[in-house]
């Protein structure tokens, strides 16, 4: 389990782009993570997406999954951004959206390590609300030294 203070040690993102509120399960040996993002009407993106029918933008759901995957990657390497390592989100495959995410939802973020080759990491990810899958796909990250 990781609270927001520890999450901030592993992710360089800050408001309004830090999209992981808590890690509830982290299994480095099993190479998987489960975290969540509480989706509030106060999120800045709801002002324009869409004012009369607020929906969390799909690209931000993908980014939230990528941030959870990044935490897993850092933990697997036993490094932090302060150590001079960063993960860049470089792509996605097989991404599918199944239902909208709205204010008041708790977005569960799950990532499982698939492979790493020449500093390119691939994770299988999904996002859920009320145990229903809202998004799934593969996240691709590049590990770089700063």
Curated annotation (Swiss-Prot):
- Keywords from the UniProt entry: Cytoplasm, Lipid A biosynthesis, Lipid biosynthesis, Lipid metabolism, Lyase
**EC id:** 4.2.1.59
Q: Name one GO molecular function term.
A: (3R)-hydroxyacyl-[acyl-carrier-protein] dehydratase activity
Assign the protein's first listed, main location to one coarse class. cytoplasm
Known InterPro entries for this protein?
A: FabA_FabZ (IPR013114), FabZ (IPR010084), HotDog_dom_sf (IPR029069)
Q: Alphabetically, which GO biological process terms does the record hold?
A: fatty acid biosynthetic process; lipid A biosynthetic process
Which residues does the Swiss-Prot or TrEMBL record annotate as the active site? Answer: 49
S-S bonds: none
Q: Where in the cell is it found?
A: Cytoplasm
What domain of life?
Answer: Bacteria
Whether DNA damage counts among this entry's keywords is no
Record's catalysed reaction(s)? a (3R)-hydroxyacyl-[ACP] = a (2E)-enoyl-[ACP] + H2O
Q: Name one GO cellular component term.
A: cytoplasm
Please give the PANTHER family that the UniProt record associates with this protein: 3-HYDROXYACYL-[ACYL-CARRIER-PROTEIN] DEHYDRATASE
Give a short account of what the protein does: Involved in unsaturated fatty acids biosynthesis. Catalyzes the dehydration of short chain beta-hydroxyacyl-ACPs and long chain saturated and unsaturated beta-hydroxyacyl-ACPs.
* Family under the similarity heading: Belongs to the thioester dehydratase family. FabZ subfamily.
Q: What is this protein called?
A: 3-hydroxyacyl-[acyl-carrier-protein] dehydratase FabZ
Tell me the organism's taxonomic lineage.
Answer: Bacteria, Pseudomonadati, Pseudomonadota, Gammaproteobacteria, Pseudomonadales
